[in-house]
Amino acid sequence: MLAGMLAAVLACVSGVPAADFGANDDAGKYADDAGAASYREMASLGMREALITVRWRPSDPLGLAERPLLDLTVAAARSAGLAVVFATYPYPPREIADGVARPDAFGAWLAELARQYPDVREFVVGNEPNQPAFWRPQLSRRAQLSARAFGPFLAAGYDAIKAVDPDLIVVGVGLSPRGNDRPDARSNVSTSPVRFLAALGAWYRASGRDRPLMDGLSFHPYPNSATDALDRGYPWPNAGFANLDRVKQAVWDAFAGSAQPTTLDGLRLYLDEVGWQVDTAGRDGYTGDENVPVTDERSQAEVYAALVRAAACDPDVAAVNLFGFRDDALRTGFQAGLYRADGSPRPALEAVQSAIAETARGCAEVAPVWRPARAVLGAQRPTVALGRRTVSVELTAAEGAVARVCLLDGRHTQASARLVVSARRVAGGTCAAGVVTANRHTRFRLVRATEQTLAVLLTAQTNPGRATTLVRPVATCLRELPLLCRSSVRRHP
């Protein structure tokens, strides 16, 4: 009873609506009953929404080929008491690469879609534009391309939908959790979520736009492997459910101080695709061979229950949609549903139902409060080794950073060293510069004099306004003095 009272109090104190739970599954659209049975099952579990895909084909800019199916399935979902969310995006990517797709045409199509379906109050604009399966090209040898190309489509979509009804919710991007950031990769040339958001923010600021791009950010926190526990995330600059703070930081780095809100001033996260695939060996209703690592049904149930509870306790999360309410029969498809292909329920069904019911009463623990980092994340004390004529310095950080490492003549205070090393030209010293790769040690070597000050300026790759200065005296013998660390904060101009 006490726990229930505490949960209710916390829910009231936060002032933020609890996360909605639902499923992202197009099977209902093609079912004989237009999905009516599945939607009733979703509602019985406590789910509140159904996410349905609606693709825009650039070569048929006014077309809506699935209109008859959409009419029936939207009505069936609404009849079951579910809110309907349309997930919209240009497709196929070859028409984007060929220049057939135009932002204004996409916006006009979205406006008509919103007018035709007034009961649909939320639109996701974009689907994994950081992946080549949905947007091409991604990268050149010199620049990130997909974010700057996608930005005008998101802007056009936002403006068009808001022109129909300013109260409609526009959720942007549909970000994939992973990308390799390698234009020379043999396959799947893609962009990490952190770097995609950085590039989208750079495009937005350069565009001069004075309106938002989105009310919320859609993110797909799939695990790197279905065998991963919920709390196992990705290394920077990728991100999973365990790394939502990294996504929030990336949004803040990209948009803080602009007309586009961050999670500090209203933007929320919509986890519109997430799922842990399960072993189906020996089960009826499946064909083909499995092509990815999978987990067992008990582990899936534990992960899903923990996912629901954790999302409910994060005030920045607006929605969670499990990808696949019922399994695909072909094993090369997706098998993460609450129902197996033969229609029998998995243990995850009861686990999700119980967790939704529990969280409907509020968060049983104090909800986490996220605040942006103002310095380079995870910047560590440098390792310093003296040679006869050189100083070797090893640096590491939890994110990518640009380093400037200087040996300044004489003794310096932390403040004076920071001032000198931040200047374009350093008088009275020698410097080296380079990139510090996240979670790896990067070595710099400088020629030294008898007595100097080692000064290091680390600047976050995704936000020049986040910098950390490290200072250490260097004499004939290295003096083991405490490291002095301070951060300087400057928003983007």
Where are these regions (language model features)?
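Short, compositionally biased P/S/T/A/G/V-rich stretches that sit at domain boundaries
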Residues: 354-394, 475-493
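Substrate-binding cleft and catalytic face of glycoside hydrolase catalytic domains
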Residues: 42-187, 224, 328
